[in-house]
């Protein structure tokens, strides 16, 4: 064994102790160093240990918080196809209420010997979560990429949409239609994308915004709820009750709930209330009315996540910073001129 370790160490340009840690699956070895040792095994004709053979089989984990929101299956499809084209097999791991947590899914994937993991809207987006979990994962030599969320505490590549720009697009569109009382329905404030959307919304609704005015805008025009149809319905009901003639929603599912809320109040969309979604989920163009929404660049984000992860796996890691992708406004049938603007020359 000593001779074998010495040969591998010499080929990889590392110490025998490092080779031993890699062969025994011990933490504390950088991903690039681990790959060098595995490459040395192959070059010298040594058979990889069983656990390391599983790792080299090309499994990549994809962790999502749910599949009920159609944006997550859309991400899974794009990422899965991109991985398959590169010879990797995606392993989808989804959290369920009362089921496995993100940490438990991570352990399952690591035990299966995945080459890396992509997290979509995971705990990295929650400002109250312990970010040390990602540092520990990196310490075990498992490359990972984080999609839709950001934390300066984590040294990893992040892939995000420009949430501030998304709100600016939505609000500017509604203002151009004559709306002056615009509400924002979105999820719990502890999430980074939510905080960024609020920033973009407030800045666009009232520029410049003083501290006092910002507080007033948030109190009157921002309603937090859940990222569900029912959550959107509840938030929109509250905003319409505050005389909003337009509602911007942080997801398409919430927007469908907002349309339901308006109808239950005897209002027509878009005649009485305009609604804008976010995501441009599959089939959303076929709702009644077809939903105006801000399109999240899912194909570009998903492909970038795969490309970045494969660079990490291949030993040429991407910069540990945030890659931001621009959204796009898609105007359909759920927005129209503000009620008071109709008939004006």
From Swiss-Prot:
UniProt KW Transcription regulation keyword: yes
Gene3D superfamilies hit by this protein: 3.40.50.2300, lambda repressor-like DNA-binding domains
SUPFAM superfamilies linked: lambda repressor-like DNA-binding domains, Periplasmic binding protein-like I
Entry keyword Transcription: yes
DNA-binding region listed in the record: 5-24
Stretches of the chain forming a coiled coil according to its record: none
HTH lacI-type domain mapped to chain residues: 1-58
Entry keyword set: DNA-binding, Repressor, Transcription, Transcription regulation
A GO MF label: DNA-binding transcription factor activity
InterPro entries (alphabetical): HTH_LacI (IPR000843), LacI/GalR-like_sensor (IPR046335), Lambda_DNA-bd_dom_sf (IPR010982), Peripla_BP_I (IPR028082)
Annotated function: Transcription repressor involved in control of expression of alpha-amylase and chitinase genes and of actinorhodin production.
Name listed for the protein in its UniProt record: HTH-type transcriptional regulator reg1
Species of the source: Streptomyces lividans
Gene: reg1
């Amino acid at each position: 064994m000593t001779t074998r370790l010495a040969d591998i160490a010499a080929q990889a340009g590392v110490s025998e102790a490092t080779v031993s840690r890699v062969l025994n699956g011990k933490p504390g070895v950088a991903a690039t160093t681990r790959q060098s040792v595995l490459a040395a095994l192959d070059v010298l004709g040594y058979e990889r240990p069983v656990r390391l053979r599983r790792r080299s089989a090309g499994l990549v984990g994809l962790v999502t918080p749910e599949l009920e929101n159609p944006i997550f299956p859309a991400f899974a499809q794009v990422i899965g196809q991109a991985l398959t084209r590169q010879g990797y097999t995606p392993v989808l791991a989804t959290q369920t209420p009362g089921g496995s947590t993100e940490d438990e899914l991570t352990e399952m994937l690591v035990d299966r010997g995945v080459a890396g993991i992509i997290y979509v809207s995971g705990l990295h987006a929650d400002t109250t979560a312990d970010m040390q979990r990602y540092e520990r994962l990196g310490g075990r030599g498992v490359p990972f990429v984080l999609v839709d969320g950001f934390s300066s505490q984590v040294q990893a590549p992040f892939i995000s949409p420009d949430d501030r720009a998304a709100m600016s697009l939505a609000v500017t569109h509604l203002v151009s239609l004559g709306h002056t009382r615009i509400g924002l329905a979105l999820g719990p404030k502890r999430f980074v994308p939510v905080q960024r959307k609020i920033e973009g919304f407030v800045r666009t609704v009232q520029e410049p915004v003083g501290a006092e005015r910002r507080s007033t805008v948030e109190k009157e025009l921002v309603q937090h709820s859940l990222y569900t149809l029912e959550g959107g319905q509840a938030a929109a009901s509250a905003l319409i009750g505050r005389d909003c003639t337009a509602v911007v929603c942080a997801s398409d599912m919430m927007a469908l709930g907002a349309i339901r809320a308006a109808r239950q109040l005897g209002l027509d969309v878009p005649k009485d209330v305009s609604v804008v979604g976010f995501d441009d989920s599959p089939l959303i163009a076929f709702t009644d009315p077809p939903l105006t929404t801000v399109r999240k660049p899912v194909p570009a984000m998903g492909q970038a996540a795969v490309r970045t992860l494969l660079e990490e796996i291949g030993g040429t890691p991407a910069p540990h910073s945030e890659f931001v992708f621009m959204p796009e406004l898609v105007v359909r049938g759920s927005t129209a001129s503000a009620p008071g603007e109709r008939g004006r020359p």
